[in-house]
Amino acid sequence: MTLDAGPLIQLDRDDRRVVVLLARANETAQPVIVPGSALAQAIRDPARQARLARLLQQPRTQVDPLDRVDATQVGKLLAASGTSDIADAHVAICARRSQTRVVTSDPDDLRRLDPTLDLVVV
């Protein structure tokens, strides 16, 4: 699964829906993709965000950086969709690449970027 910023924030607030999804992912050895741009939106005080810190330390959690290749893909996706949210576009790019569903609290923006994404709304 690929997480956007919303579920990362919800995890930090101990949202049961997000906790359960992550527990299931762990039980089934499913990778958890965290786009770096989504992490940047969610992280504010790493020393106080213990739940988020634990997620990031899990062996199956992968933080995907916004490198040159992804930045180019993000720019193309934003141009094609007529939208402007870099983090959402990066989430879409990461989910496409990993062929995973996206866990989100804001499905409308992601659907505008890519209507083919498999979204799980929390």
Where is each model-derived feature located?
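Alpha-helix capping/helix-boundary segments
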Residues: 7-8, 38, 70, 90-91, ...
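Active-site regions of enzymes building and remodeling cell-envelope glycoconjugates
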Residues: 61, 115-122
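Short, well-structured N-terminal submotif of metal-dependent ribonuclease cores
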Residues: 1-34, 43-59, 120
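Short loop/helix-cap segments at secondary-structure boundaries that form the rim of catalytic
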Residues: 108-116
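Acidic catalytic patch
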Residues: 60-81
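Acidic, metal-associated active-site segment
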Residues: 42, 85-101
